[in-house]
Amino acid sequence: RSLSSAASDVYKRQDLYNEALKLNMSVIVEVHTVEEAKSALRFKDSLIGINNRNLKTLKTDINTTFDIHDVLVDHPGPLISESGIKTKDELLELSNKTSIKTFLIGESLLKDLDNNSIFSVL
């Protein structure tokens, strides 16, 4: 189950999180801003996904991960950089400059199936 900090109120997210843990499910808390990241720290047993896609404009910017990462560096669970990773160099930059080693890559893989440049890093 994924809990988007932009879409749910705090109490609803907490209830969904608690219920998922009771059912032995993993939870990904998705954040888009520093404020959402600070709020997500309460979900200690979750994975936290930093979504690089602006939900209002649908534009992606990997700098979102860099902007938010420092807030989450002490989170005990895995961090994920989500969306907008288009090249091998971007993936390596994210990996080398943050503690993040988990990435959600979709659109770029589908658009670049023949080139396989990003696959060589994975």
Where do the language-model regions lie?
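Glycine-rich beta-to-alpha transition loops that act as phosphate-gripper elements at the mouths
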Residues: 29-34, 78-89, 108
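Catalytic cores of alpha/beta
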Residues: 34-43, 85-101
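Glycine/Thr-rich beta-alpha phosphate-binding loop at enzyme active sites
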Residues: 41-70
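C-terminal helical cap(s) of enzyme catalytic domains, especially alpha/beta-barrels
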Residues: 67-71, 111-122
